[in-house]
Amino acid sequence: GTVPCGESCVFIPCITGIAGCSCKNKVCYID
């Protein structure tokens, strides 16, 4: 998880998770 997906995951999971993004430090990242 090094590239931010432009989405936060403080209250809800990453919607961009369908694109391979994961939550890290309250922000969604993708490798």
Swiss-Prot record:
Q: How is it modified after translation?
A: Contains 3 disulfide bonds. This is a cyclic peptide.
Among its keywords, does the record have Calcium?
no
Q: Which domain of life is it from?
A: Eukaryota
Enumerate the PROSITE patterns for this protein. Answer: CYCLOTIDE (PS51052), CYCLOTIDE_BRACELET (PS60008)
Which keywords does this chain's UniProt record carry? Disulfide bond, Knottin, Plant defense
Q: Does the keyword Transcription regulation apply?
A: no
Q: What's noted about domains in the record?
A: The presence of a 'disulfide through disulfide knot' structurally defines this protein as a knottin.
Under which name does UniProt file this protein?
A: Cyclotide cter-J
